[in-house]
């Protein structure tokens, strides 16, 4: 029985990426373009020993929604509450990577500490690097407002600005804004669980936006 136990543990080690690169945000920092590039280059990445898992779409949002237990789509327009199946399937894909797995979703920046711990434990890899792309908040705000308009908020720009800036950290109209954009707090949570040596911030150069590619 001890032999079988050792064999099962060995198989678990074999079914694991040697390294995982995680692009965790932030929102409105060119993430969609980056993810489109990853998706378009997945065959080339594979030849280089990097696996970019597929879960529907060019990014890994559905897997992260599954981890978070969030509703995929608009709640009042037929959105579906995610169960953990997508996340479990995604983890299997990551662990099957022969060398390096690449994970990308800006919704990772919204994880609670408990969810970050689960993310880390489920992936089960000792070599994980977390990358965040960052732009000045002043550049993010107009783009964030446009995004919120797409999902149905009715407030005009001035009213919305007051809702997020009168009391930074609190937003009565779009609560997710500060969950996503209290950048220092988000970074602190990831540093706490992965170590500062494993969390990298890349500041987007507005004059040379293509440098990220």
Regions found by a protein language model. Give the residues of each.
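Conserved small/polar residues in nucleotide/adenosyl-binding loops
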Residues: 1
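PAPS-dependent sulfotransferase catalytic core
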Residues: 4-7, 11-101, 105-107, 137, ...
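Short, function-defining helix-loop hinge/capping sites that tune catalysis or transport
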Residues: 38-39, 57, 112-114, 144
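PAPS-dependent sulfotransferase catalytic domain
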Residues: 44-46, 113-213
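The substrate-binding groove and active-site-proximal loops of carbohydrate-active enzymes
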Residues: 106-109, 175
